[in-house]
């Protein structure tokens, strides 16, 4: 487990260079960090991460490409897997022996490089964003929930097109994201929200009302299951039935959600003061992440999927506190402390990773 902590120390050290490096040097640091993380995630063995063995099973269940194209619609619907995974797995299976390693490495390249590119494009504090990405997102989405990890990369890259009102590029990237993970479909609503101003009262209610409904045990998922949304309805019904069988409980005030509530509240009050043109839309996405968590809490898998999908904007949002908190050193310390809390939450509380090892 020591290697995880050494990596965290490395990225904290890198973040301390935020004000000391030129933009070109920062771009080089981001590139090298991306390569390091791709190798770290892509070369891991099946003993690292809770989902690796699940992906081995899914990979073995996928038909070869010749069979897949015979009845594509039936295959997608019956498998309940996204088309991208079916296509990639079937292609790799047809061309590589022990192809699961190739598949995992490919997802690492895609998921990590897309997020590094998004940091380069969106963040004003790139090295601090890199630290938040490593401690709060990398382990969960690029070493565990890898399909969602790639989808998130495309969604983050779509955010500039919300500001530009470029619907073609936004919905093109959204479509690709959905092909990697169906939960990404919910991101489409953010194209239509006001990205210049934030109504503080409305967004406070967006945070508070779902919490009240959750405490009153209103089952929003059961209501949605009464409507027909194609394969999305199938997913919701499957998760709802699974919840009834498993009787699993959800901690509605877990660390990640509480932190996002605090961050969202801070930026509801301060987003318009930020110099960053993405601050308002990032704040709204963060607020909806909390709202969906509580609205969908009757089906924990869906609640966490949507929350984790939308909470990835914290990569950009948390470092923006540097613009708003004085003196600046306190804000930088705040970002590092938050990253430490994220990291320890992944390592000690979630406990989904064993000691690191490679497959060779």
Can you annotate each of these PLM segments?
Residues 24, 116-135:
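Transmembrane-helix signature of polytopic, membrane-embedded enzymes
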Residues 53-56, 63, 86, 191-304, ...:
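Alpha-helical transmembrane segments and terminal signal-anchor/GPI-anchor hydrophobic tails
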Residues 53-61, 68, 73-97:
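Short hydrophobic/aromatic helix or loop-helix immediately within or flanking a transmembrane segment
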Residues 105-121:
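Transmembrane-helix motifs of polytopic, lipid-linked glycan transferases
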Residues 127-145, 149-156, 183:
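Membrane-embedded helix bundles of polyisoprenyl
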Residues 138, 169-193, 294:
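Membrane-interface alpha helices of multi-pass inner-membrane proteins
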Residues 143-150, 155, 180, 268-325:
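Membrane-water interface signatures at transmembrane helix termini and the short loops
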Residues 155-169:
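Membrane-interface transmembrane helices that cradle and orient dolichyl/undecaprenyl
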């Amino acid at each position: 487990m020591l290697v995880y902590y050494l990596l965290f120390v490395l990225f904290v050290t890198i973040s301390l260079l935020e004000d000391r490096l030129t933009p070109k040097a920062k771009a080089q640091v981001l590139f090298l960090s991306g390569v390091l993380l791709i190798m770290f995630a892509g070369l891991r063995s099946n003993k690292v991460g809770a989902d690796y063995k699940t992906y081995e099973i899914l990979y073995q269940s996928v038909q070869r490409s010749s069979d897949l194209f015979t009845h594509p619609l039936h295959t997608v619907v019956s498998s309940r897997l996204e088309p991208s995974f079916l296509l990639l797995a079937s292609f790799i299976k047809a061309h590589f022996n022990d192809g699961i390693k190739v598949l995992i490495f490919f997802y690492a390249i895609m998921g990590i490089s897309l997020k590094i590119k998004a940091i380069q494009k969106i963040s004003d504090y790139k090295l601090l964003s890199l630290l938040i990405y490593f401690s709060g997102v990398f382990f969960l989405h690029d070493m565990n929930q890898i399909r969602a990890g790639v989808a998130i990369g495309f969604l983050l890259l779509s955010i500039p097109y919300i500001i530009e009102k470029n619907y073609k590029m936004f919905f093109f990237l959204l479509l690709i994201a959905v092909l990697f993970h169906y939960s990404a479909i919910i991101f489409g609503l953010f194209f239509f929200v006001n990205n210049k101003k934030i109504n503080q009262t409305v967004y406070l209610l967006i945070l508070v009302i779902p919490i009240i409904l959750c405490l009153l045990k209103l089952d929003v998922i059961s209501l949605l299951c009464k409507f027909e949304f194609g394969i999305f309805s199938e997913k919701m019904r499957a998760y709802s039935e699974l919840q009834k069988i498993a009787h699993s409980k959800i901690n509605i005030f877990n660390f990640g959600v509480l932190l996002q509530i605090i961050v969202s509240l801070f930026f509801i009050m301060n987003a318009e003061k930020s110099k960053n043109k993405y601050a308002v839309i990032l704040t709204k996405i963060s607020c909806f992440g909390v709202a969906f968590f509580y609205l969908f809490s009757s089906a924990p898998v869906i609640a966490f999927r949507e929350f984790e999908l939308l909470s990835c904007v914290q990569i950009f949002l948390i470092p923006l506190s540097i613009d708003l908190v004085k003196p600046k050193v306190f804000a930088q310390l705040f970002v590092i402390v938050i990253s430490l809390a994220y990291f320890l939450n992944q390592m000690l509380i979630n406990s989904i990773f064993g000691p690191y090892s490679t497959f060779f």
